[in-house]
Amino acid sequence: MTSSLVGSEMCIRDRIKRERNAVKDTRPSAKLSYARMSVQKACFVLDAIRGKDVETALAIVTYNPRYASSVIEKLLKSAIANAENNNGMSTENLYVEECYANKGPTMKRIRPRAQGRAYRIEKRTSHLTIVLNER
């Protein structure tokens, strides 16, 4: 009796796995975790490239003087390479469908000050995600 239960339980698990894999997102993307920048500073650059085609987005981040733009440029190039190699998409039709920054853990450091005091320095991190799609 237990063997029949085990068999039916396996069928249910297989069905659940098949359903989960069918829903998987097939859009090319790239993620960077624990980037050493605050979410607010990363969003300045991400807001500028959201919805643009990839050539325009690359031009924007290349000539943007912010530190976040150099990190996002690498991430965008990685997403473009993923689209070409893994999905077989051409770069002419690609655009930035989603790009967002989520808050990561904050490293807390101490800066010594006068008369025995200490100030807390918060080194913020963020998780960056770029999702591309074809027009």
What is each of the regions a protein language model found here?
Residues 1-12:
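Single conserved hydrophobic/aromatic residue that forms the stacking wall/gate
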Residues 13-101, 125-135:
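Ribosome large-subunit tunnel/peptidyl-transferase-proximal elements
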Residues 104-135:
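Strongly charged
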Residues 5, 49, 102, 114:
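Short glycine/serine/threonine-biased micro-segments
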